């Protein structure tokens, strides 16, 4: 099972539905849920930190990003919280918009396996990661944001600024499937 921490974003139920379509059980929990409350259940194989409107109300996300031993994917605000937890800098976007954008993948990696080097995604850019922590590498960027996706260099810890769970994002299902594979789920190819 994948646990989705609800940071109040409009797409949190869409994340759960996208995982269901992949055959992956998922449960939405409040963002006040602690890492200990999550990992006490051995069926939990991964955590997704959802998007949301307010970085100050994402209570346990940074602790989860720092201390989880199971894979974590941050989406939009969740991506920003992961970066912030490790000392990255998050601030207002230069181009504040909610729109379809082109994403450029730097090179194939475990999160973007099977995804072309350029694709269209639906993204929200009010705030964004401006400076990436040293222990992370940038996986993807766009013309309006230099940090569209990150990965911790040693842990299964990922972030994406865009929304892979919405149908407007090309290959979003592939990205979510790749994350689920990191969590130990298997799929018929």
From Swiss-Prot:
Domain of life: Archaea
Reaction equations catalysed: XMP + L-glutamine + ATP + H2O = GMP + L-glutamate + AMP + diphosphate + 2 H(+)
Pfam family, one: GATase
Keyword Nucleotide-binding assigned: yes
Keyword Hydrolase: no
Active-site feature positions: 76, 163, 165
Pathway(s) the chain acts in: Purine metabolism; GMP biosynthesis; GMP from XMP (L-Gln route): step 1/1
InterPro entries per UniProt: Class_I_gatase-like, GATASE, GMP_synth_GATase, GMP_synthase_A
GO molecular function: ATP binding; GMP synthase activity
EC numbers, comma separated: 6.3.5.2
Keyword terms of this UniProt record: ATP-binding, Glutamine amidotransferase, GMP biosynthesis, Ligase, Nucleotide-binding, Purine biosynthesis
A GO CC term attached to the entry: cytosol
Subunit structure comment from the entry: Heterodimer composed of a glutamine amidotransferase subunit (A) and a GMP-binding subunit (B).
Protein name as annotated: GMP synthase [glutamine-hydrolyzing] subunit A
Source organism of the structure: Methanococcus maripaludis (strain C7 / ATCC BAA-1331)
């Amino acid at each position: 099972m994948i646990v989705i921490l609800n940071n109040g974003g409009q797409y949190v139920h869409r994340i759960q539905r996208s995982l269901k379509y992949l055959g992956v059980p998922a449960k939405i929990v409040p963002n006040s849920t602690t890492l200990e409350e999550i990992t006490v259940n051995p069926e939990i194989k991964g955590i997704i930190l959802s998007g949301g409107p307010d970085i100050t109300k994402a209570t346990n996300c940074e602790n989860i990003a720092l201390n989880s031993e199971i894979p974590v994917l941050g989406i939009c605000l969740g991506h920003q919280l992961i970066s912030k937890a490790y000392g990255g800098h998050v601030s207002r976007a230069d181009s504040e918009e909610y729109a379809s954008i082109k994403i450029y993948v730097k090179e194939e990696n475990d999160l973007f396996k099977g995804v072309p080097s350029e694709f269209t995604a639906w993204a929200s850019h009010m705030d964004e990661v401006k400076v990436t922590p040293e222990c992370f590498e940038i996986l993807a960027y766009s013309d309006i944001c230099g940090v569209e996706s990150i990965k911790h260099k040693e842990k299964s810890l990922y972030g994406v600024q865009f929304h892979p769970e919405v149908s407007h994002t090309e290959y979003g299902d592939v990205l979510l499937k790749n994350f689920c594979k990191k969590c130990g789920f298997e799929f018929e190819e």
